[in-house]
């Protein structure tokens, strides 16, 4: 396979963090497997996550046909259409994605970009059929057992909601460090090694 393209979305307020280190290892793994990599750092770029009344008013308008509606999200849309692998690097807070990343999904996965709703249809039709793999690289404060009891809503958003807008054979990969609040330095290092190893494989 040649010409693999990975779009990495990083969401953490502090670049100098464990999640920031995971971003570095994510990029290293992807590049080792021959991917061309693009990265968006949502906090550093000052992304506006609030889904506004104007966003709602144009929610079902095909954004491919109305570029004026997407001026502030155009770069993200272009990256989504370019990639075959989407990687989300973020902490898990309150069982889900940080508000910044959830807002990115709300505002960027719009009509004509992530989905279409043709006349007479009873469900959304996927538009991100170029995406054949979705990966989350994340940390959880609590143990895997506690997260399982809480339902892991963030994981379900990726594996059930986002995935259905992608290629019908799209693979998902959840690379997580659980119990990060009490883990050792050795466990953190092992997690970072695992991130790079998993991303170095196709």
Language model features by range: what are they?
Residues 1, 78, 126-129, 167:
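Structural motif
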Residues 1-113, 186, 190-202:
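N-terminal beta1-alpha1-beta2 submodule of the flavodoxin-like/Rossmannoid cofactor-binding fold
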Residues 9-10, 137-138, 176:
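Short beta-strands and strand-loop turn motifs
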Residues 13-16, 92, 141-145, 179-182:
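Short histidine/acidic/glycine/proline-rich micro-motifs that form metal-
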Residues 42, 139, 177-179:
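Active-site donor-binding loop signature of nucleotide-sugar glycosyltransferases
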Residues 83, 89, 129-130, 162-170:
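A structural motif corresponding to the C-terminal end of an alpha-helix
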Residues 116-164:
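Short, glycine-/small-residue-rich phosphate/pyrophosphate-handling segment
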Residues 145-149, 153-202:
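Glycine-rich phosphate/pyrophosphate-binding loop and the adjoining helix
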